């Protein structure tokens, strides 16, 4: 009888895995390079999308661009019988630095695909609406921003088109953020809005430049991309900082776990791509729209191309010494944009289908031969068990794993706590795993 139960249990796991794999591959197949190209061209055609540019014209400036984005989200919602909640999230900022030279409304365009089971748990994909040229305060010159960041914005719209055809347990937010080039103002506004409204955020996938394959060094690479993540939350408490000094976890904050999740799912479902876990908040001394979320303790990463071309980035359109400058559409590789949009779409789907991670996870095993764990048992009937991941302390990613049943404590025999780092995930009946949960406390 017991053997029969074991066989049935593993048959269910295999069946669930097959359904999950089918969903992921179907999503990949539906991402359209042609639609991405058309949307990038449309955004470029607005001439400039500078945060301080025209908001009245129907054909030029950031006002026309954000109205078009909102219209696209509304059309997607119409096609899925109203499955998206589309609105402007408005923020008023007074001039306060060298890049915000006048008072301005910085308006984000938000589309929420509400989850069927956890409507207040959100996984977010963002792109930036605004663009700039060499002078960050020049809001009149043509600033096509084809790669920076029409690619990320078009990818967000395309992900919404595809994922709106499916239902997920958690909510997905697709958002165009404004004011990035002037100082990350749109992200600051939405992160504050999320905190005010008590959003339970799984994480934000910030897409900022996902279309360039030829670097300033001449190298061409259309098979890799970077995932930037900070090591630990910026708002951690003094106690958390104190504990980490003695118990480890210097590279195991919530953003780093999100980055590992994206890395591992990409390697599994898109093996021709080579994701690179970059252990930095962002590029050296620079910033992106995931940072305002990180500042409030939310998990967030930046997904972007491996090779940047600084002749195209933040440049007036011109030719000097036979070198072409400017972020024009000729510099965008649309097949590559499709690949990175697919990376986003499948990770949104996987995380939107995932159960909550184990709560109050504690670790023990000091001066003992085996490491042990305890956590709060999730009593929801679709949780079929948990899975322990571990790695050597010098390794960037999880190396080993062990599936366990519906329990709230477990001892990993003959694995010494000193030599490894650990996390645990929840697994639901459909085979979806939660984000990795790193222990937050200890016990004897």
Regions found by a protein language model. Give the residues of each.
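Conserved aromatic anchor
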Residues: 369-382
């Amino acid at each position: 009888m017991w053997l029969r139960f074991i066989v049935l249990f593993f048959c269910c796991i295999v069946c669930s895995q097959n359904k999950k794999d089918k969903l992921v591959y179907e999503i990949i197949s539906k991402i359209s390079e042609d639609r991405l190209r058309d949307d990038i061209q449309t955004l470029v055609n607005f001439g400039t999308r500078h945060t301080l540019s025209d908001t009245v014209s129907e054909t030029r400036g950031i006002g026309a661009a954000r109205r078009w984005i909102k219209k696209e989200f509304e059309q997607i919602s119409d096609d899925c019988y109203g499955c998206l909640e589309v609105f402007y999230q408005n923020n008023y900022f007074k001039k306060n630095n060298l890049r915000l030279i006048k008072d301005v409304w910085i308006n984000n365009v938000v589309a929420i695909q509400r989850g069927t089971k956890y409507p207040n748990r959100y996984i977010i994909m963002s792109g930036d609406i605004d663009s700039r040229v060499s002078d960050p305060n020049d809001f009149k010159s043509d600033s096509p921003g084809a790669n920076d960041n029409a690619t990320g914005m078009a990818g967000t719209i395309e992900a919404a088109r595809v994922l709106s055809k499916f239902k997920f347990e958690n909510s997905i937010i697709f958002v165009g953020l404004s004011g990035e080039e002037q100082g990350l103002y749109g992200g600051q506004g939405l992160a504050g809005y999320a905190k005010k409204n008590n959003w339970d955020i799984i994480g934000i996938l910030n897409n900022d430049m996902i279309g360039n394959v030829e670097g300033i060094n001449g190298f061409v690479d259309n098979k890799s991309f970077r995932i930037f993540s900070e090591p630990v939350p910026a708002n951690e408490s003094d106690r958390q900082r104190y504990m980490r000094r003695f118990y480890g976890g210097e590279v195991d904050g919530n953003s780093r776990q999100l980055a590992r999740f994206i890395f591992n799912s990409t390697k599994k479902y898109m093996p021709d791509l080579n994701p690179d876990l970059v252990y930095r908040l962002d590029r050296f001394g620079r910033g992106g729209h995931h940072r305002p979320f990180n500042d409030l303790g939310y998990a967030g990463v930046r997904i972007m191309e491996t090779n940047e071309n600084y002749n195209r980035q933040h440049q007036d359109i011109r030719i000097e010494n036979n070198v072409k400058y400017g972020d024009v559409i000729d510099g965008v590789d649309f097949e590559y944009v499709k690949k990175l949009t697919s990376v986003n779409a499948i990770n949104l789907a996987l995380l939107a289908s995932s159960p909550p991670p184990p709560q109050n996870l504690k670790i023990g095993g000091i001066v003992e031969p085996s490491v042990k764990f305890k956590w709060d048992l999730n009593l929801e009937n679709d949780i079929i068990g948990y899975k322990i991941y571990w790695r050597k302390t010098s390794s960037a990613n999880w190396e080993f794993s062990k599936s366990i049943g519906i329990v709230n404590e477990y001892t990993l025999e003959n694995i010494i706590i000193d030599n490894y780092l650990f996390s645990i995930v929840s697994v639901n009946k459909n085979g979806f795993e939660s984000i990795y949960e790193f222990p937050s406390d200890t016990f004897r």
